[in-house]
Amino acid sequence: MNLYERLMWTAKENRYPMHMPGHKRAGLFTMANPYAFDVTEIDDTDNLHQPEGEILWEMEQMKQKYGTKDSYLLVNGSTCGILAAISACCHPGDTIVIARNCHRSVYHAVELLSLKPVYVYPEVDKETGICLGISSEEVKRVIADTKPACVVLTSPTYEGVVSNIRAIAEIVHEENSLLVVDEAHGAHFAWSDKFPETAMEQGADLVIESLHKTLPALTQTAVLHRASDRVLAERVEHYLEIGRASCRERV
């Protein structure tokens, strides 16, 4: 069985996918010929690296929905956004405070920029072994001694645990540091008041969300939100240029 046959077999299985991506293979739109949508940066299809038309409109709509300064669409996942966000906040050799349960892309950013990591540890549920939230008291204790360029947390976690981002943001900003939140599993928060507040609403500076995890978007679709002017848009956009694929997939 080749890959095409395997995917066709999976698609025909009568099973509900209790996993990513968020569209659950629901067939929200019909695309009989995917090749018809696969085009390069010709005049009529806009350019993700210099959006002026439909892509710019999409980002403006997202900015209004999420209440941000800027929202940048990503086609190579939250990993791209995390690398760009940390690069925009730090210079090579800086100290960075990160939650020990962060995504591996955070550690890749530490490696690429030769950053000095200092860890904050989540509490652990003794019965399940699941990591709980990061306490604001622990963040305050750690950053008082380290004066990091930025603090990076994951909220919600893979298991859905949310930290008190509002309290943490206040502490981080009192120390003239920046707060980056990996909200990859919380892109749906803004769509109902029954969900927790987004990290943007609670004062984080840069927030990364994976639209494909909990919303009806194709795999690798993500967004980087610039939620405050503490981080220059020019720096964010510069590092997105470096991290984004030069050949974009529009589908």
Question: Which residues are covered by each model-predicted region?
Answer:
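N-terminal "arm"/small-domain region of PLP-dependent enzymes with the aminotransferase-like
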Residues: 1-53
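Conserved PLP-enzyme active-site core in the AAT-like
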Residues: 3-9, 29, 50, 65-68, ...
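Pocket-edge structural micro-motifs
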Residues: 22, 75, 249
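Conserved N-terminal alpha-helix of the aminotransferase class I/II PLP-enzyme fold
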Residues: 35-78, 101
